[in-house]
From Swiss-Prot:
Record field: catalytic activity: L-threonine + NAD(+) = (2S)-2-amino-3-oxobutanoate + NADH + H(+)
Function description: Catalyzes the NAD(+)-dependent oxidation of L-threonine to 2-amino-3-ketobutyrate.
Assembly mode: Homotetramer.
Binding-site positions, NAD(+): I175, D195, R200, L262, G263, L264, I286, Y287
Cofactor or coenzyme needed: Zn(2+)
Active site as annotated: T40 (charge relay system), H43 (charge relay system)
Pathway note: Amino-acid degradation; L-threonine degradation via oxydo-reductase pathway; glycine from L-threonine: step 1/2
Protein name: L-threonine 3-dehydrogenase
EC number(s) given by UniProt: 1.1.1.103
Similarity comment text for this entry: Belongs to the zinc-containing alcohol dehydrogenase family.
Organism: Streptomyces coelicolor (strain ATCC BAA-471 / A3(2) / M145)
One example of a Gene Ontology biological process annotation: L-threonine catabolic process to glycine
Cofactor note: Binds 2 Zn(2+) ions per subunit.
Length: 342
């Protein structure tokens, strides 16, 4: 089968022929229809410092996908050939305290699809049945392909109650954009999102942000004044991983404010912990999705009319992956989709 492979320990990806995956008794074989390009895939392609430490070549990359089940292991009873599915990209041990308690997203032995094992940028992918989400109601294929990052957005945005709250989101990348859409849909009063890309800020306006603020020429305090906020933001969603974004967020929270932090910093940085303590701010780290509560919430949000169409800005055949990756790496748009049927 054709697959996008990190063949060598150097920058680049290769469209190559590799063997089709085999399945065990509890696994599912899936024909891939479409995939989404993630920031993780960009790091692997660029072969940056993180990738050099985390990746062992050769590796089929990719973890965001939608496909159709073509075969199941003998012990799989609730998934059948023909089902339209997406997959949870974090594979867990099933044996640790957190897994046994049902907190699978907290497993210390998590292995990432397309990072620690062959992934989904291929004509076929195999997963344990426990990692397969069946779309029981129709979902647009492009949206179904990005259920993984959509789950990151939902997990982060719904970490705290949002109804009537003023929400600050730092970082208007694809996950930040989806979080803005979720926050508005879930009843937030104001949703302010910051970035330095006007193209992405325009996408934020399309998904319903109350105010899309370019912090290269305005401050979050300016945004507060424009909206008439006098006490700061109730909820903060940090999506950028930028030190200055986290510091600005803390400085603009109300007393008792709550911050969910998904953005992954590249290195340690100082934080005004005195402000966190004296303002009684809660900071919660987010990694991945809650399995499968977040997936259920995603489906319900879409059934309820949540529109993610503006977030998807690029569509390419998998054969045009070089152009697709360049688009995704530009930092100007939203999610980029690879079509494995074209």
């Amino acid at each position: 089968m054709k697959a996008l492979v990190k063949e060598n320990a150097e920058p680049g990806l290769w469209l190559a022929d590799v063997p089709e995956p085999t399945i065990g008794s509890g696994d599912v074989l899936i024909k891939v229809l479409r995939t989404g390009i993630c920031g993780t895939d960009l790091h692997i392609r660029a072969w940056d410092g993180w990738a050099q430490q985390a990746i062992r070549t050769p590796l089929v990359v990719g973890h965001e996908f939608v496909g159709e089940v073509v075969d199941t292991g003998r012990d799989v009873t609730d998934i059948k050939a023909g089902d339209r599915v997406s997959g949870e990209g974090h594979l867990v041990c099933g044996k640790c305290r957190n897994c046994l308690a049902g907190r699978r997203h907290l497993c210390r032995a998590t292995v990432g699809l397309g990072v620690g094992r062959d992934g989904a940028f291929a004509e076929y992918v195999a997963l344990p049945a426990s990692n397969v989400w069946v779309h029981r109601v129709p979902v647009d294929l492009d949206v179904a392909a990005i259920f993984d990052p959509f789950g990151n957005a939902v997990h982060t945005a719904l970490s705290f109650p949002l109804v009537g709250e003023d929400v600050l989101i730092t970082g208007a990348g694809p996950i930040g954009l989806m979080a803005a859409a979720v926050a508005r849909h879930a009843g937030a009063r104001n949703v302010v999102i910051t970035d330095v890309s006007e193209e992405r800020l325009e996408l934020a306006r399309k998904v319903g942000a109350t105010l899309a603020l370019n912090v290269s020429d305005a401050t979050i305090a300016d945004g507060q004044r424009e909206l008439g906020l006098r006490e700061g933001f109730d909820i903060g969603l940090e999506m950028s991983g930028r030190p200055e974004a986290m510091r600005d967020m803390i400085a603009n929270m109300t007393h008792g404010g709550r911050i969910a932090m998904l953005g992954l910093p590249a290195e340690e940085f100082p934080v005004d912990w005195a402000r966190v303590v004296t303002s009684m701010i809660t900071v919660k780290g987010i990694y991945g999705r809650e399995m499968f509560e977040t997936w259920y919430a995603m489906s319900v949000l879409l059934e309820g009319g949540l529109d993610l169409a503006p977030v998807i800005t690029g569509r390419y055949s998998h054969r045009d992956f070089e152009a697709a990756f360049a688009d995704a790496a530009s930092g100007r748009g939203g999610k980029v989709i690879l079509d494995w049927t074209a």
